[in-house]
């Protein structure tokens, strides 16, 4: 068994904060290579390990001006490492929807990468209703006029670990990134979100924003929010914000006035971020998977 470092920040911060990277136990020598699957159009992939440790690669290509949507659903109870490489051409759009529906005790390592040429766009949606641990590392580079929209929803329960790292390089002019991460933590769940917006020299006219909302439902949960904006260009605009806290008394009163006790109110709010994102996607299969997992996978 090896200890590997994953989800590294592009620029290190104070070591005492414990957020520069994450140490993860992984059997590198025993990892089974599941090969590479290439998609050049819309598709749905059901991905599972089939072995105690497995690695798979997915390449998604979109021709110039094309729009491609791919759904990746991760299942099973083992350790799964999936590398998803996005290859949009000029003015193409790739929409990637990932759903973690793995069992408790399972571990998902998801790596998404893209070099987005002129005028292209990536839409990344990640829904985490499953009970497995998730380590996600996303790295994208935007050329002139390219854009990223990223939205993530999660529910951390029991001793679950959710460790997210998203780094977007604004390399070209007039690029745009919008990042929204929302979720809830209950039991003794732990979550880290590192969001980096990196304005490179030559990215004039670019904008980037990241927003996070975290609902804390217990005294034993651990949340770490790490927004990072790097700037080597003057004419850019970068913003970040976070709303973190428990249910306030006004919200509880609202629910109680409609017949819900505290436990029921917390349950409804805990599910809200993932359910809302699934609803907004408008995909029946995704919504069914999310509801199945939120209802206990039974």
What are the language-model segments listed below?
Residues 1-49:
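Long, low-complexity, mixed-charge
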Residues 13, 274-277, 290:
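Generic structural signal of hydrophobic/aromatic residues within well-ordered alpha-helices
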Residues 252-276:
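Extended amphipathic alpha-helical segments enriched in small hydrophobics
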């Amino acid at each position: 068994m090896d200890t590997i470092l994953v989800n590294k920040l592009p620029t290190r911060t104070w070591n005492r904060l414990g957020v520069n990277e994450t140490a993860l136990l992984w059997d590198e020598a025993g990892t089974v290579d599941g090969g590479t699957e290439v998609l050049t159009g819309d598709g749905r992939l059901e991905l599972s390990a089939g072995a105690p440790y497995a690695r798979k690669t997915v390449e998604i290509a979109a021709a110039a001006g094309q729009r491609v949507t791919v759904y990746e659903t991760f299942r099973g109870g083992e350790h799964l490492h999936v590398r998803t490489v996005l290859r949009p051409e000029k003015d193409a759009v790739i929409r990637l929807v990932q759903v973690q529906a793995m069992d408790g005790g399972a571990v998902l390592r998801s790596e998404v990468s893209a070099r987005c040429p002129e005028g292209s766009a990536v839409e990344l949606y990640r829904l985490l209703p499953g009970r497995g641990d998730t380590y996600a590392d996303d790295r994208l580079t935007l050329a002139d006029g390219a854009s990223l929209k990223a939205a993530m929803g999660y529910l951390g329960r029991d001793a679950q670990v959710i460790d997210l790292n998203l780094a977007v390089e604004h390399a070209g002019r007039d690029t745009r990134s919008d990042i929204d991460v929302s979720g809830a933590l209950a039991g003794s769940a732990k979550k880290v979100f590192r969001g980096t917006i990196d304005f490179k020299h030559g990215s004039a006219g670019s904008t980037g924003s990241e927003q996070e909302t975290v609902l804390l439902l217990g005294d034993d949960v651990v949340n770490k929010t790490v927004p990072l904006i790097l700037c080597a260009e003057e004419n850019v605009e970068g913003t970040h914000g976070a709303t973190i806290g428990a249910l306030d008394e006004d919200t509880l009163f609202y629910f109680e006035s409609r017949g819900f006790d505290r436990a029921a109110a917390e349950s409804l709010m805990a599910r809200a971020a993932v359910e809302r994102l699934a609803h907004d996607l408008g995909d029946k299969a995704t919504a069914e998977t999310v509801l199945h997992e939120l209802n206990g996978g039974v």
